[in-house]
């Protein structure tokens, strides 16, 4: 069995780990446009200096080795072809799968409060790039 997991946030990481627990022999490939695993919930700690990028990581140090998960980082899935059981990455690479887990997360939302969206000191944090 070959699994592809798209997204390396909490859902993707835990999904990949759970897949491994259910299938010890499967090939599991986790694909993320991010270069780091990090908790989006505490990005504000990076902004105020309480944590470094490395300190935002919520996985054990040897996570990918321990669970035998191949991590393709810094690559974005640009196309999913369900009928062919494949994904295409932004560099043109095609990866085949038998099952896919989409764990791409959400997006930041600024509520429709008067003048809030126009304010220059309001920022929606979604990913590490927003905090840099």
Map each language-model feature to its residues.
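Beta1-alpha1 glycine-rich phosphate/pyrophosphate-binding loop at the start
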Residues: 2-70
């Amino acid at each position: 069995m070959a699994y592809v997991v798209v997204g390396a946030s909490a859902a993707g990481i835990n999904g990949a780990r759970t897949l491994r627990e259910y299938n010890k022999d499967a090939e599991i490939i986790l694909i993320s446009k991010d270069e780091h695993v990090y908790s989006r919930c505490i990005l504000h700690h990076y902004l105020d200096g309480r944590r470094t990028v490395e300190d935002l990581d919520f996985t054990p140090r040897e996570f990918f080795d321990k669970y035998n998960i191949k991590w393709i980082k810094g690559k974005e899935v640009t196309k999913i072809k369900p009928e062919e059981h494949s994904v295409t990455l932004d560099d043109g690479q095609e990866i085949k799968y038998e099952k896919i887990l989409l764990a791409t997360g959400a997006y930041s939302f600024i509520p429709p409060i008067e003048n809030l969206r126009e304010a220059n000191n309001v920022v929606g944090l979604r990913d590490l790039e927003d905090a840099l």
